[in-house]
Regions:
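Acidic/histidine-rich helix-loop elements
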Residues: 64-65, 72, 76
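Outer membrane beta-barrel
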Residues: 34-57, 75-215, 238-243, 247-255, ...
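Charge-dense, low-complexity intrinsically disordered segments
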Residues: 74, 183, 233, 281, ...
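N-terminal periplasmic/intermembrane-space "pro-region" immediately following the signal or transit peptide
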Residues: 2-64
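Loop-centered beta-sheet repeat module
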Residues: 217, 223-271
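Detector for outer-membrane/organellar transmembrane beta-barrel domains
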Residues: 64, 249-348
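Short, basic, glycine/proline-bearing loop/turn elements
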Residues: 71, 123-124, 275-279
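Outer-membrane beta-barrel translocator domains and adjoining extracellular loop/strand segments
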Residues: 57-64, 111-118, 132-134, 165-170, ...
C-alpha cells in the first residue's frame, strides 16, 4: 500500500499507542497484499514503512520477569526504530499468470550488533546483523483459474492468527505488532510452499503445504517463533506441514476468521542428527495450532480481537535433543513449553 505510517508516541507497559488515522485495510488478507496494489497494471511497484518512538516504563534488565521484585523500580527507557520498510513488486503476465514479491527491511537493515542474552545469564552476545534484517517475505508465481480457484507456488505468507493474516501497520493500533501472537508465532510467518485459495460467496479460503518447523529453534521465551527461520542458505524440509485459513464476510463490516496448523518439527534440520533416535522412539514434535479472530469496521468503530492456542508434542524430548547441541550450534539449548496461548482485543 502506498501509505507511510509515522508513529511518535509514548508506549506504556501494555504497549498502548496512537497512529495516524487512515482507511483500514483489516478486511484484506496479507496473502493478497501484493496484488491488491497492482491497480490492474502489468507492472506495479508499491510499499510502506514505519518510523516509531516508544518509551517503556519498565526495566530493560534480562531478569525483569524472573526476578521482578528486584527490578520493579528501574527507570524507563526510550527508543526510536524503523520496524518495517517494505517494497512490493508485481507483474501480470496475462492469461491468469501473475508474479508477486515483497522485500522487507526490518529495524534498519543489517550490520553488526550486540545484545544481552537471557539464556546466557545476561552476557553480551554479538550478532551479525544490525538488530534487523533484510528478508524476501514473498516471492511467488500464481495461476488464477477463477475467483474461486487460484494456485500459488513460491515463498508465501502463512496466515496463522490475526497478526500474520493482517500484518500491515494500519491493521493494528499499537506502535508495534501486538505482542501476544508476535511472541509465540513466527511473525511475519513466511515460508516456501504451495497454496490453494479462492473466494466462494461470502467465504475466503486458503490451504497451504509447507516445510515443517525446526524444533531445535524453539525456546521457552518465544515458543515456536524462531522455528520457521533457518541459519543455513536453504530451508531444511525433511518434515512437512499444512496450514488452513477461512474468513467469512456475511455480515457487512464484520470479518470472522479461523486458522489452523499441523506439522512435525523434530528431525527437520541439517544433518538429521536426531533421525535415528526420533524414529526409534517415534518422536514427532507435532505442532498443532488453532486460532479465531475477528475484525469489525463499521459505524465509525474498528474493533479487532483474537484467541490462539498451540500445542507441542514431545516437548520434553525437544529439550533433550537441543541440550546435545555443541556450543557453536546456531540452535537453542533450552526448555520449551508444551502449550502456548495468546489473546487480545483492541477498539478505536
Amino acid at each position: 500500500m502506498n501509505n507511510f505510517k509515522t508513529l511518535l508516541t509514548a508506549c506504556v507497559l501494555a504497549g498502548i499507542g496512537l497512529s495516524v488515522p487512515s482507511t483500514s485495510s483489516a478486511q484484506v488478507s496479507a496473502a493478497d497484499s501484493v496484488m491488491n496494489h497492482a491497480n490492474k497494471q502489468k507492472l506495479s511497484v508499491g510499499g510502506y514503512g514505519e518510523v516509531t518512538y516508544s518509551r517503556e516504563f519498565f526495566s530493560d534488565n534480562v531478569y525483569r520477569y524472573s526476578k521482578a521484585s528486584a527490578y520493579k523500580n528501574d527507570p524507563s527507557h526510550g527508543k526510536f526504530d524503523i520496524p518495517h520498510a517494505v517494497i512490493y513488486l508485481s507483474y501480470d503476465f496475462g492469461k491468469g499468470w501473475t508474479m508477486g514479491s515483497e522485500i522487507e527491511f526490518e529495524h534498519g537493515g543489517t550490520g553488526a550488533s550486540y545484545e544481552k542474552e537471557y539464556e546466557e545469564s545476561g552476557e553480551w552476545e554479538q550478532e551479525v546483523e544490525k538488530g534487523g534484517e533484510v528478508e524476501l517475505e514473498q516471492f511467488w508465481i500464481q495461476k488464477s483459474f477463477s475467483r474461486s480457484l487460484n494456485v500459488r507456488f513460491g515463498h508465501i505468507v502463512v496466515p496463522i492468527g490475526l497478526t500474520n493474516a493482517h500484518h500491515e501497520p494500519l491493521n493494528f493500533f499499537t506502535v508495534y505488532r501486538p505482542e501476544g501472537e508476535a511472541t509465540i508465532f513466527p511473525c511475519t510467518w513466511h515460508q516456501t510452499g504451495a497454496s490453494l485459495w479462492g473466494v466462494l460467496g461470502k467465504f475466503r479460503y486458503e490451504v497451504q503445504l509447507l516445510a515443517g518447523l525446526n524444533a531445535l529453534s524453539f525456546s521457552r521465551d518465544n515458543w515456536i517463533q524462531k522455528g520457521g527461520t533457518t541459519a543455513f542458505e536453504f530451508e531444511p524440509s525433511n518434515k512437512y506441514a499444512v496450514a488452513l485459513r477461512i474468513d467469512n464476510y456475511s455480515i457487512p463490516g464484520l470479518r470472522l476468521g479461523i486458522s489452523g496448523y499441523y506439522g512435525h518439527s523434530i528431525d527437520n534440520s541439517l544433518g538429521r542428527e536426531a533421525s535415528k533416535e526420533a524414529n526409534s522412539r517415534n518422536l514427532k514434535g507435532a505442532v498443532t495450532i488453532g486460532t479465531f479472530d475477528f475484525t469489525y469496521n463499521a459505524h465509525n468503530w474498528i474493533v479487532r480481537g483474537n484467541f490462539d492456542y498451540g500445542h507441542l508434542g514431545d516437548a520434553n524430548d525437544v529439550r533433550l535433543l537441543t541440550g546435545r547441541q555443541t556450543k557453536t550450534s546456531p540452535f537453542n539449548r533450552d526448555y520449551v513449553g508444551k502449550a502456548a496461548m495468546a489473546t487480545g482485543i483492541e477498539a478505536g
